[in-house]
Every structure is written in structure tokens, then in C-alpha cells.
């Protein structure tokens, strides 16, 4: 991708300051809503939730919206053609990214802090680089491995701190989160061509709908009765589905209409800081020099990798 391509908005040929400001506003709201997800999940665990029940509650509230949107999109002949041609592939890739990666991520939250989870997931661009290098033979540009190394050092600082204060389960939780980030990176690479062929909205609806159906089937198979769950857990699960899944996806889509890819990617860099603020104020998680330095390293690492794309 050339610099001239990156400097063009995705759908607008003109970007007056009002459009840019609106785009930044939408992108920041989307990033903020995505970033408070770990806090909601930690609270859900406190009210007796587990990975499957939390995902099931999120699916109950989000999947109907995506299904309605999908049928709305299928009014167009082009979308119906793309659905028939790419629907199975989109469903498969969606289950990989929206079910398996999400399951590992939520399972990890039983063992690690919200701040550490967000930083581990935030490092997924490093896996995209490594997979592209090893599998697709795309040589990273100079300085990329240095940026990746700094990001891992930042995470290691927080893991070291949390191991001394929480225990060795930190390693299990970190491993689950890293696996989630790796699978999400695979999902991004696999979805890139599909999104260009069928459009991001239709792909997202099919992927989210398929993943949601899988988790609902799993919850029924495991005998989880949503009605018998703690009312506060149900409320948190619904909030996860609406405020941390559906709404941010719409806000990010709206931002994509008004911002260049580089502008959009920069707004996501505030995510770990937003998670830290809510984790400290709501969950009373500690924030030490280890966390501050680790966060700086990770954010710098990701920003550096994005600049080299």
C-alpha cells in the first residue's frame, strides 16, 4: 500500500475538518467501548460467571442485532450473490475470530488483571507481522523486530509484577491471552481478502452471527440456563453484547467513512490507557511503575509497527 493510498479516506474523497473531527469522535467512542470490555468481564466473574455463560449472554443480546442487519443488507442483489459465494468461508473465519479467540480471551480473564489482558491482546500486530513473515514470506521492514521486542519487554514487566503479587496462575492466564491474540492475528490475515470481496458489514454480520450461534449451542449442550443466572450477571452480559460488541463495531464503521486508515489506527492506541483508568477506579487494580513503564513500551511498540506497515 502506497502512502498516497493511505492518505485517502476509505469512502470519502474529501475530508473537511468537520468530517475528521466527527471521525475521530466516533473512533474514540468505539475504542473506549471496546477497551472497557475487560472490566465488564472481570465484574461478570465476580457474580458467578464463567467463559461460556458470559459469551452466551453476550450472544443473546448481540446476535439478533447482527442477524437483523444481515437481512437488511441482503436486500441488495450484490450482497445476496456474495452471501452465496463467500458465506461459508466468512462463517468459518468468523467462528475462528469471534468464537475461539473470544473464548480464550474471556477464559484468560479468570487469572489475569484487566490491564494485563488488554496489553497482551494489544500486541496482536506483532503476530500478524511474524505470521506474514514465516508463512507468507513477507519480509518485515527495518526496525520491526526491535519494536516487537520492546512490546514483549513491556508485557514481561507487568507479568513479573503480577506473579509476585497474585501467583503463578498469571502464566496460565497470560498464555490463554497470547493464544487469543495469535488466533485473532490469523483471523485478520484470513479475513482480509474476504472483506475486500464481500464488504466489511456483511462479513461482520455473518461472522458474528455464526460465532454467536456456536456459543449458544455450546451453552445449551452444557446445560446453562440463562434465566437462573444472577440478575447482575445477566445485566453485565447484556451490556457486553450491546455496549462492548455491537455499538463499538458501528462506531468504528462510521469512523472508517471519515478517516484515513492511519488516522483510524492511531485512535486505537489510547485503548490500554482507557482500560487502565476503568480497571483502577472500578476494580481497584493496582497501577505501579511496572504497569506504567510496561504500558509505554507496549503502546510504543504497536505504534512503531503500524508506522512501518
Task: Identify the residue ranges that each predicted region occupies.
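Hydrophobic transmembrane alpha-helices of multi-pass small-molecule transport proteins
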Residues: 66, 131, 140-162, 215, ...
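Specific alpha-helical transmembrane segments that line the substrate/conduction pathway
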Residues: 53-64, 102-139, 144, 180, ...
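Glycine-/small-residue-enriched transmembrane alpha-helix faces in small-molecule transporters
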Residues: 2-57, 95, 166-193, 211-213, ...
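Hydrophobic/small/kink-forming positions within alpha-helical transmembrane segments
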Residues: 35, 39, 95-99, 103, ...
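Hydrophobic alpha-helical transmembrane segments of multi-pass integral membrane proteins
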Residues: 21-25, 52-72, 88-92, 143-153, ...
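Specific transmembrane alpha-helical segments of multi-pass solute transporters/efflux pumps
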Residues: 33, 38, 70-115, 157, ...
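Membrane-interface helix termini and inter-helical loops of multi-pass transporters
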Residues: 39-47, 51, 78, 106-110, ...
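Helix-helix packing/entry segments at the starts of transmembrane helices
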Residues: 31, 57, 116-123, 190-213, ...
Amino acid at each position: 500500500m502506497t502512502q498516497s493510498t493511505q492518505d485517502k479516506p476509505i469512502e470519502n474523497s474529501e475530508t473537511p475538518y468537520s468530517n475528521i473531527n466527527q471521525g475521530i469522535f466516533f473512533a474514540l467512542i468505539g475504542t473506549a467501548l471496546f477497551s472497557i470490555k475487560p472490566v465488564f468481564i472481570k465484574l461478570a466473574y465476580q457474580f458467578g460467571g464463567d467463559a461460556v455463560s458470559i459469551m452466551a449472554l453476550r450472544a443473546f443480546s448481540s446476535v439478533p442485532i447482527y442477524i437483523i442487519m444481515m437481512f437488511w443488507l441482503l436486500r441488495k442483489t450484490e450482497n445476496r450473490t456474495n452471501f452465496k459465494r463467500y458465506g461459508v468461508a466468512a462463517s468459518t473465519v468468523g467462528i475462528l475470530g469471534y468464537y475461539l479467540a473470544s473464548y480464550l480471551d474471556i477464559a484468560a480473564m479468570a487469572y489475569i488483571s484487566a490491564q494485563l489482558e488488554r496489553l497482551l491482546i494489544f500486541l496482536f500486530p506483532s503476530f500478524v507481522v511474524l505470521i506474514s513473515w514465516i508463512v507468507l514470506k513477507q519480509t518485515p521492514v527495518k526496525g520491526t523486530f526491535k519494536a516487537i521486542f520492546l512490546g514483549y519487554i513491556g508485557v514481561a514487566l507487568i507479568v513479573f509484577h503480577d506473579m509476585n503479587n497474585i501467583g503463578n496462575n498469571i502464566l496460565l492466564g497470560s498464555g490463554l491471552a497470547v493464544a487469543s491474540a495469535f488466533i485473532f492475528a490469523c483471523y485478520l490475515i484470513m479475513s482480509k481478502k474476504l472483506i475486500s470481496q464481500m464488504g466489511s458489514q456483511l462479513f461482520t454480520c455473518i461472522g458474528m452471527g455464526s460465532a454467536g450461534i456456536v456459543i449458544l449451542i455450546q451453552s445449551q449442550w452444557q446445560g446453562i440456563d440463562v434465566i437462573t443466572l444472577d440478575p447482575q450477571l445477566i445485566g453485565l452480559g447484556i451490556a457486553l453484547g450491546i455496549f462492548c460488541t455491537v455499538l463499538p463495531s458501528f462506531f468504528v464503521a462510521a469512523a472508517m467513512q471519515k478517516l484515513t486508515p492511519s488516522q483510524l489506527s492511531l485512535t486505537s492506541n489510547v485503548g490500554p490507557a482507557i482500560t487502565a483508568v476503568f480497571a483502577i477506579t472500578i476494580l481497584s487494580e493496582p497501577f505501579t511503575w511496572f504497569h506504567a513503564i510496561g504500558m509505554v513500551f507496549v503502546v510504543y511498540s504497536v505504534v512503531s509497527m503500524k508506522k512501518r506497515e
